[in-house]
Structure formats: structure tokens, C-alpha cells
Amino acid sequence: MADIPATSEGSANTSEAVVEYQQPTPEFLQRKIYFLVDQLRTYHSELPENLQTRISYDLLTELANCVLNDGIFVIVKALMELQHETERHLIKIRMQAENEYEIEVAEWRSKIKDPEELRHILGLMKIKHTKKLHESDTKIIEILDQKVNDQQSTLQKAGVPGFYVTENPKEIKIQMFLLDFILRLSRLKYEPGK
């Protein structure tokens, strides 16, 4: 079997197109963490005092370390977009139920001429509509609760401190503030030396 000579022609041409990525220095990362912690402390100080006591400085430091990886910003923004899309869909479903009721009322008004009979039918329809809306609203709440659960699980698996699956409204409120902090940090540009 003959030896095949190795050439560098192919790699020489492609190396020009490859942008070299430099690993951040430990000093750069440390300064960025200080910057992030400082920002988080500012956000923290804006919270009502009863919430400030529930979010420790240790948690803020862990959060700053976590968001050094910009991937966390991508995850949070994707979850936010999914949440908005789900909410738009659920609003559309709710509006559809309202519109169906209005159409049905209009149809009965055009068919029934006797005011007493119409009043009776519209009363029954109102009861039916109220029950249907209650069932629809219950279903919407269940879907939103599941969405919150999924988001908590995703953020916990991504290693974001302060996130775990809970139904406790106080804990969920804290998590919402942490999400707000992350979104606010995602809009900042860290510039060393400033």
C-alpha cells in the first residue's frame, strides 16, 4: 500500500475563514462577575424590603456566575417567547368562546319574537355560557400552571440558582424577580475598563 502524502492546501484556505476565539482570562471573568453582582445588587435594592430578605447576596453571586454563560440568556428568552405564544393562544381561545356566545344570542334574537320566551332562552344561555367560560378559564389556568412548572424545571436543569419546581406563590414570585434580573442583565453590555 502506497503512502499518501499529506498536504496543507485545504487547511490553509479554510483557516482564513475561521475566526479565532480567545478564551477569556480569569481576570476578565472576575471583573465581569463583580460587574454582574453589582448590577444584581442594584436590582435587589429596588425590591420591597420583604422580598429583599428572601433573596440573599449568596444567591445573587451564584446567579452572576451562572449568567457568565450567555446560554442562560438564550434559554430565558426562549422560555419567555414560548410563554407569550401560549398566552396569545389562550387569549384567542377565550375570545372565541365569547364570540360564539354573542353569535348564538344574535341568532336567538332573530328567531324568537316573543319577549317572554326570548328572555327565558337568553337566561338559560347565560347560565350555559357562564359554566362554559368557567370550565374554559379553569383549563387555561391548568395550562399556565403547567407552563410555569415546565419553565421551573428547565431552569433548574440548566443550573440557574433559585429555580426548582414549586407551586408556592411566594417562591414563584421570587423566581419571577430572578427572571426579571436575568432579562435586565441580558440587555447590558459588559465593557472592561469602564
Curated annotation (Swiss-Prot):
Pfam families: DGCR6. It comes from Drosophila melanogaster. Belongs to the gonadal family. In stage 6-14 egg chamber nurse cells and oocytes of adult females and spermatocyte cysts and bundles of maturing sperm of larval, pupal and adult males. This is Gonadal protein gdl. It comes from the Eukaryota. Disulfide bonds: none annotated.
